[in-house]
Swiss-Prot record:
Its main location: cytoplasm. Residues 556-615 form the KH domain. It comes from Coxiella burnetii (strain CbuK_Q154) (Coxiella burnetii (strain Q154)). One of its GO terms (biological process) is mRNA catabolic process. Pfam families: KH_1, PNPase, RNase_PH, RNase_PH_C, S1. The keyword Ubl conjugation does not apply. It comes from the Bacteria. Its EC number is 2.7.7.8. It catalyses: RNA(n+1) + phosphate = RNA(n) + a ribonucleoside 5'-diphosphate. One of its GO terms (molecular function) is RNA binding. Involved in mRNA degradation. Catalyzes the phosphorolysis of single-stranded polyribonucleotides processively in the 3'- to 5'-direction. It is found in: Cytoplasm. This is Polyribonucleotide nucleotidyltransferase.
Length: 696
């Protein structure tokens, strides 16, 4: 295969696609370069689909190699290990816009691998990874509906920024990634500083317009490479079986979808499905061709989809009896766990999140070592989705991709209102335990985390709430749904999550399964989401509308002090012996900054004050004329040395011991004796002269 190269200008960056030199045994492979960021993106697909498979097995793996940044991995083995959180999140970011572009009925196994070979600190890797995946799939000839583009959009000084660098993002009020085709937006992922809905929508449209140059370049690159298209035809529909399923199951399914309780509804639907299968098996008894359960399940699912969608588009109540704008009943409790620092139980319909906040010291910060460099995360958010929350039996292991993704979305939503470490000296960990789930558990986590943070006394800027929106669209008819159920998410055309305060949006995530989503539809969804968000906030505010005035007594108690930086060595001691003795004696954690700032984290205020006193004694300066209580440490013929501070001794000359003449120092003093002395002189060398007889 000849080497093919395509270069185009994308904003301020030059982007290059190459194929034909690397990874030539893959079904499709592209090396994409943007600035000095270089990725190899490969795609491999099996030629045959597995019999009876009713889903599309797409796997996307994004992996970072430390050599890309000129680094050697840490740890004993000195090689890359399990995927990092960033790798998992980027894999999901690539997967989400790709998946809806594969044709319905295509069930061949496909794997996309994006490998970072070189990283430029000015160019984040996710945008070139998405572009490379689109180009590689296009080259492979796998059935795929169009070229996919992607763009990052920032917002600073009232202007949108296209593909900003990491440094520019630090000053940006918005970090938004949008992916789409020539005619449609398919995916949005963003974090914002309480921006208006109009600015968010403008960013989406700006990014979609800007990515057209990339979409055109990918199409030209694929055409120039001239890969052969796969010969694939969608599976034909068995019209006779389809008619039979409709006749036998449509009426009972419509009744089943009037059942508002999720578990009962699912049980009834399963019973209808089982009965259909049993009836079909009885009818085919003795025939050579057995019942095709897979074919039956596909038709049954399509019937479910049509029933639910028609019900909504014709103005009938939704599955649980609501109209399109109504939010499910909400209950809120705070302070539900007696020994946690902050907790909240947020229930919305059949979705429930128990969210717990824990406050820790700087030593509890999470160390991150990736291609962007080493850093500390002072705000940690974890989301757990155990199998019992959906009434299932499942294997309990580490967090799955979905849990990591939902946790990051909830974290994005609340980060803009959480104080930085210099304003609130605690490392914060929030854990959301999903106890029940029927749609929008990530948004329940947002609401619960805002409440749990305020319950813990974290001075957040404002309460935050989130809501998941849905869309049902057939031709020109559509309905935007507020607070969607799990079934509405599964059977609908859009999952649109919006979180924010009463002032503006802090996070927006959108996944669209169809084309034809207009600006007007997105505007309506954002406006309807704002209405729902403000409604949820009003309920939350009735229970807790601002942070508690102080942190929990169970949280670490901070005492902060400042010392002369030259005295730091006195506090630490040789080999750390002094500070270790203080921490053990007072049961405190002590952190010292180079500028002399000392943070003492204690279990109680008393322990913190005790540690502070010890440090004050160690760093105190001797004051001329002040009376001290000291210990005699050494006696000589000409006087006695007395320790008046932990690191300071002074001399009481024999002439300063008593009013009368002293012939022998030992007649008046002994080693270990505690006496009161007055500082009468500090010479240029810092030597201290003391007196006993000059004390009034």
């Amino acid at each position: 295969m000849n080497k093919i190269r395509k270069t185009f200008q994308y904003g301020k960056h030059e982007v290059t696609f190459e194929t034909g030199e690397m990874a030539r045994q893959a079904t499709g492979a592209v090396v994409v370069r943007m600035g000095d960021t270089v990725l190899l993106v490969s795609v491999v697909a099996k030629k045959e689909a597995e019999e009876g498979r009713d889903f599309f097995p797409l796997t996307v793996n994004y992996q970072e190699k430390t050599y890309a940044a000129g680094k050697i991995p840490g740890g004993y083995f000195k090689r890359e290990g399990r995927p990092t959180e960033k790798e998992t999140l980027t894999s999901r970011l690539i997967d989400r816009p790709l998946r809806p572009l594969f044709p319905k009925g295509f069930t061949n196994e496909v794997q996309v691998i994006a490998t970072v070979l070189s990283v430029d600190s000015k160019v984040p890797t996710d945008i070139p990874a998405i572009l490379g995946a689109s180009a590689a799939i296009g080259l492979s000839g796998i059935p795929f509906n169009g070229s996919l583009g992607a763009a990052r959009v920032g917002y600073r000084g009232g202007e949108y920024l296209l593909n900003p660098s990491l440094d520019e993002l630090k000053d940006s009020a918005l970090d938004l990634v949008v992916a789409g085709t020539r005619d449609a937006v398919l995916m949005v992922e963003s974090e914002a500083q309480e921006l208006p809905e109009s600015v968010m929508l403008g960013a989406v449209l700006h990014g979609h317009q800007a990515m057209q140059v990339a979409i055109q370049a990918i199409a030209e690159f694929i055409q120039e490479a001239g890969g052969a298209k796969w010969e694939w035809e969608p599976p034909t529909v068995n019209t006779a079986l389809e008619k039979l399923v409709v006749e036998k199951s449509e009426a009972p399914l419509k009744k089943a979808y009037q059942i508002q309780e999720k578990t009962a509804r699912q049980a009834q639907i399963q019973a209808i499905r089982d009965q259909l299968l049993a009836d079909r098996a009885a009818e085919r008894e003795g025939e050579e061709n057995a019942v095709n359960e897979h074919e039956l399940a596909v038709i049954f699912h399509e019937l479910e989809r049509r029933i639910v969608r028609e019900q909504i588009l014709t103005g009938q109540p939704r599955i649980d009896g609501r109209d399109t704008k109504t939010v499910r009943p909400i209950t809120v409790k705070v302070g539900v766990l007696p020994r946690s620092h902050g907790s909240a139980l947020f229930t919305r319909g059949e979705t429930q999140a128990l969210v717990v906040t824990t406050l820790g010291t700087e030593r509890d910060a999470q160390s991150i070592d990736d291609l962007d460099g080493d850093r500390q995360e002072e705000f940690i958010f974890h989301y757990n989705f155990p199998p019992f929350c959906v009434g299932e039996v499942g294997f309990m292991s580490g967090p799955k991709r979905r849990e990591i993704g939902h946790g990051r979305l909830a974290k994005r939503a609340v980060v803009p209102v959480v104080p930085t470490l210099d304003k609130f000296p605690y490392v914060i960990r929030v854990v959301s335990e999903i106890l029940e789930s029927n749609g929008s558990s990530s948004m329940a986590s947002v609401c619960g985390s805002s409440l749990a943070l305020m319950d813990a006394g974290v001075p957040t800027k404002a309460p935050v709430a989130g809501i998941a929106m849905g869309l049902i669209k057939e031709n020109d008819k559509y309905a935007v749904l507020s607070d969607i159920l799990g079934d509405e998410d599964h059977l609908g055309d859009m999952d649109f999550k919006v979180a924010g305060t009463s002032n503006g949006v802090t996070a927006l995530q959108m996944d669209i399964k169809i084309e034809g989503i207009t600006k007007e539809i997105m505007e309506q969804a954002l406006d309807q989401a704002k209405e729902g968000r403000l409604h949820i906030l009003s309920i939350m505010n009735k229970v807790l509308d601002k942070p508690r005035s102080q942190v929990s007594d169970l949280a670490p108690q901070y005492v902060t002090m400042k010392i002369n930086p030259e005295k730091i060595r006195d506090v630490i001691g040789k080999g750390g012996v002094v500070i270790r003795e203080i921490t053990e004696a007072t049961n405190c954690a002590i952190d010292i900054s180079d500028d002399g700032t000392i943070k003492i984290a204690a279990h109680t205020t008393e322990e913190g004050e005790a540690a502070k006193r010890r440090i004050e004694e160690l760093t105190a300066e001797v004051e001329l004329g002040k009376v001290y209580e000291g210990t005699v440490v050494k006696i000589t013929d000409f006087g006695a040395f007395v320790q008046i501070l932990p690191n300071t001794q002074g001399l009481v000359h024999i002439s300063q011991i008593a009013q009368e003449r002293v012939e022998n120092v030992r007649d008046y003093l002994e080693e270990g004796q505690v006496i009161r002395v007055k500082v009468i002189e500090i010479d240029r060398q810092g030597r201290v002269r003391l007196s006993m007889k000059q004390i009034d």
